[in-house]
């Protein structure tokens, strides 16, 4: 066994394949390219799990909020999709790889990390558009898939930082810079590798 820091990361499918993303979140191929280049350069193995929205409703779907996905059928669908990626995580950890994190998509009702208060649409259900001034006491939840993934990792005592990539933010935005700082801190905890 090598003493090198061998790393893996769990990543939402749309960050590798932007075509899976619902249209309002945009495709942003340059951002996916930048993320994949960084992970490959740092020799981080990528475990990509299937997009639960695409596999449940296809590519031509309307944007929805977390409320619509929060049901027993969709949660079960997510659990099924995570079976193989979780087996891979277990096998890598068993073989002394370090799980450096999970990367989800900001404002995703399934893979996001911070789903707060959202506007209500004309059907009186939650829309994918966040409220500009949320109530201070409004709970912030994870997206459905991220929540289930967190539960599965916790069951086994595996901790991994959950990061959220702000795909709609400009490259120089504070949110985007904070994402990169967090990712680098988790991938390179001992400083720049030689």
Residue spans for each PLM region:
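Divalent-metal-activated hydrolytic enzyme cores
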Residues: 59-67, 71-94, 127-194
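Short amphipathic alpha-helices and their capping/turn segments at secondary-structure boundaries
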Residues: 1-4, 31-45, 84-100
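Internal, conserved structured core segments that host functional sites
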Residues: 98-122, 134, 148-149
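Residues lining hydrophobic/aromatic ligand-binding pockets adjacent to catalytic sites
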Residues: 2-7, 18-30, 114, 118-121, ...
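Extended cationic-aromatic binding surfaces that line active-site or macromolecule-binding grooves
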Residues: 14
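Short catalytic/ligand-binding loop motif for oxyanion handling, primarily in non-cytosolic enzymes
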Residues: 18-19, 56-58, 108-114, 171-174
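Short, surface-exposed acidic-centric catalytic microdomains
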Residues: 27-69
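A structural signal for short, well-ordered beta-strand segments and their strand-loop junctions
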Residues: 10, 46-50, 98-105, 161-166
């Amino acid at each position: 066994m090598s003493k090198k820091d061998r790393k893996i990361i769990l990543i939402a499918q749309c960050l590798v394949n932007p075509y899976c993303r619902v249209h309002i979140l945009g495709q942003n191929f340059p951002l996916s390219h930048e993320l994949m280049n960084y992970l490959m350069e740092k020799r981080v193995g990528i475990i990509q799990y299937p997009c639960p929205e695409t596999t449940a409703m296809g590519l031509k779907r309307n944007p929805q909020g977390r409320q619509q996905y929060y049901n027993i059928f969709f949660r079960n669908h997510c659990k099924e999709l995570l079976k193989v990626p979780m087996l891979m995580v277990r096998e890598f950890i068993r073989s002394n790889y370090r799980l450096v994190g999970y990367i989800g998509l900001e404002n995703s009702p399934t893979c996001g990390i911070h789903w707060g208060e959202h506007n209500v649409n004309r059907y009186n259900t939650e829309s994918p558009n966040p409220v500009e001034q949320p109530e201070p006491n409004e709970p912030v939840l994870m997206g459905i898939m991220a929540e289930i993934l967190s539960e599965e990792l916790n069951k086994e005592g595996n901790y991994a930082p959950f990061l959220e990539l702000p795909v709609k933010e400009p490259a120089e935005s504070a949110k985007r810079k904070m994402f990169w700082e967090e990712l680098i801190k988790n991938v390179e905890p001992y400083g720049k590798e030689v």
